[in-house]
Amino acid sequence: MTGVFDRRVPSIRSGDFQAPFPTSAAMHHPSQESPTLPESSATDSDYYSPAGAAPHGYCSPTSASYGKALNPYQYQYHGVNGSAAGYPAKAYADYGYASPYHQYGGAYNRVPSATSQPEKEVAEPEVRMVNGKPKKVRKPRTIYSSFQLAALQRRFQKTQYLALPERAELAASLGLTQTQVKIWFQNKRSKIKKIMKNGEMPPEHSPSSSDPMACNSPQSPAVWEPQGSSRSLSHHPHAHPPTSNQSPASSYLENSASWYPSAASSINSHLPPPGSLQHPLALASGTLY
């Protein structure tokens, strides 16, 4: 037991304890395989040098560019005496990774601000809750003056539909907007159609609608004279028309009896018979000859 232990102890060298892990150069050189740990040589450091010294193993002489690709990254290896050497690491900003990120990041932050601006400009309509249901608040109704209503009514009697120039002219003359005039005509037409559908006579066709000062009573007689004067003149063609002693009020009541037959009897009872007044007038006219 002691003899075997003594034979293997000298194979372990003090320089091998300085490298805690085997270098990659030892794994790439199959010619240096040994039962003990491999030794570091000067040729191992030349493989990772920036100048690209003579490589070993299966690496070709033209593979010196692989060593240059490792320059920007930090790499640490152990030399012959166990001293550590390495290359300084470069930041990500040197390779241009940070600038595109900030460029797109700034654009991403600007896009929501641009889209949110039009949303603030659009004003939402006022909504009021009625019986637990949302309802939009309607605009107040337009109150027309009597002058405006009379002018609109007269124009509606002429034509129920207005052209665009006519509507603009009428709205300007009345101090209204074209929309208000259009809505008034639409409402008026729908009202007329509804009345005619129900069979009622629209107020526009009544005599009082065209002229508010018109009278619905029958026309009065043109000449204020009694009806019997024509008979007295027929008997005496050469006689002058006599002057009537009957008052205009009595003659009007007598003529109105024909308009109201029900009241004719009551009127005739209060008036004297026409022959009693006309007979002395005829005798007086005959004395002129």
UniProtKB/Swiss-Prot annotation:
Key word Thylakoid present: no
GO terms, molecular function: DNA binding; DNA-binding transcription activator activity, RNA polymerase II-specific; HMG box domain binding; RNA polymerase II cis-regulatory region sequence-specific DNA binding; transcription cis-regulatory region binding
Biological processes annotated in GO: anatomical structure formation involved in morphogenesis; axon guidance; axonogenesis; BMP signaling pathway; bone morphogenesis; cell population proliferation; ear development; embryonic limb morphogenesis
The entry's keywords: Activator, Developmental protein, DNA-binding, Homeobox, Nucleus, Osteogenesis, Phosphoprotein, Transcription, Transcription regulation
SUPFAM superfamilies membership: Homeodomain-like
Residue positions where Phosphoserine is found in the record: 34, 217
DNA-binding region in chain numbering: 137-196
Gene3D superfamilies cross-referenced by the UniProt entry: Homeodomain-like
PROSITE patterns assigned: HOMEOBOX_1, HOMEOBOX_2
Skewed-composition ranges (Polar residues): 32-46, 206-220, 242-253
Ranges where the record places region Disordered: 1-49, 198-253, 270-289
Effect in UniProt of substituting residue 34 to A: Inhibits its transcriptional activity
Assembly and interaction partners: Interacts with XRCC6 (Ku70).
Similarity comment text for this entry: Belongs to the distal-less homeobox family.
Function statement: Transcriptional factor involved in bone development. Acts as an immediate early BMP-responsive transcriptional activator essential for osteoblast differentiation. Stimulates ALPL promoter activity in a RUNX2-independent manner during osteoblast differentiation. Stimulates SP7 promoter activity during osteoblast differentiation. Promotes cell proliferation by up-regulating MYC promoter activity. Involved as a positive regulator of both chondrogenesis and chondrocyte hypertrophy in the endochondral skeleton. Binds to the homeodomain-response element of the ALPL and SP7 promoter.
Protein name: Homeobox protein DLX-5
Organism this protein belongs to: Mus musculus
